[in-house]
Amino acid sequence: MAICPELAQTDKSALANLSDETETLKNSTDEVQTSSSFSSSGGRQSSPLTSGSKLEREKQTPSLEQGDTQSELLDYKNYEKKLSKKWINYLKLKDSNFERHQPDTKLPTEITRVSDEELNALQSYCTMKINLIHRRGDSKKKTSSRHKKLHLGLDVEASERDAFSCTVPDELLNRIYFKNMRTTPKQEAAAKQHISYQCPYCNRKRAELALSAFLKQKKTLLESFLLQERIDEHLHTKDFLTRIGEAHQDFPRLSDDPRIIWKRLTEKSHIRYSGFERSETEQKLQRDGNSACHLPFSLPFLKRLTLIKPELVIVNDNV
């Protein structure tokens, strides 16, 4: 129930004024009663030995006091009636304000009028759930034999199946569905939205990622420059012509003597074939007892080729 704060303040002020007026009325009535009792007691306690003038005064004063008290009582009665009317008006106004500011509480009662079938189904479902919870608690508390435990477990499973297999009316499901549909937008609206460009953590992570991407880019650029320099250096120092020149350094010259050329070739062939270790294929062939040479060609044939090679070179040179 939502009541306006201004109305609440006015109610509080009116209530305070009425309470003050009632308090003053009580005090005044008490004073009148005490004064009337005091006057009556004073008149009774007067001694008979007083003078005549004093007696006359005493006779006159009670009549005056009685008249005053009667007028005061009439005034207080009128004031009391006015105060009671004020209280009645205040209570009526309060009831009217309460009824005026209570439309929301009546709406749910009108909306939540459901059918008897729906109420019965809901009640049966709740009772099943309560019984299931009680059975689970009892089964946990009991410490019996294995057979009893198995039996209780089967009973609990059967009761769970019965509880979950109970039919729920479509009206109840639809009502719950629409209620959830109404509450979800409210929850989404009330939820605090995360704005990435205002979040300091997101901005810090974004800066770190940008820095790492910048460093990777610069690193790849420098590596590409270094690789290009190495490729250029290799091409300039180890090009095709230099390779051909290095290969031609070992070749014999046209002005060399054929006997010197032959001597060099024989020395190279001896050094080359004497320093090699035997391969695995050669070892297998020797184990098998084969007498074939370890090379694909025999030594005499190789010598014959080496002998022929300088002649060919010489012939080409002569040509």
UniProtKB/Swiss-Prot annotation:
Gene name, Swiss-Prot/TrEMBL: C8orf48
Biased composition (Low complexity): 35-51
PANTHER family attached to this UniProt entry: CHROMOSOME 8 OPEN READING FRAME 48 (PTHR35256), EXPRESSED SEQUENCE AI429214 (PTHR35256:SF1)
Pfam families, alphabetized: DUF4606 (PF15379)
Protein's name according to its UniProt entry: Uncharacterized protein C8orf48
Cystine connections: none
Top-level division of the source organism's lineage: Eukaryota
Composition skew (Polar residues), residue ranges: 25-34, 61-70
Signal peptide start and end residues: none
Residue ranges, annotated region (Disordered): 21-70
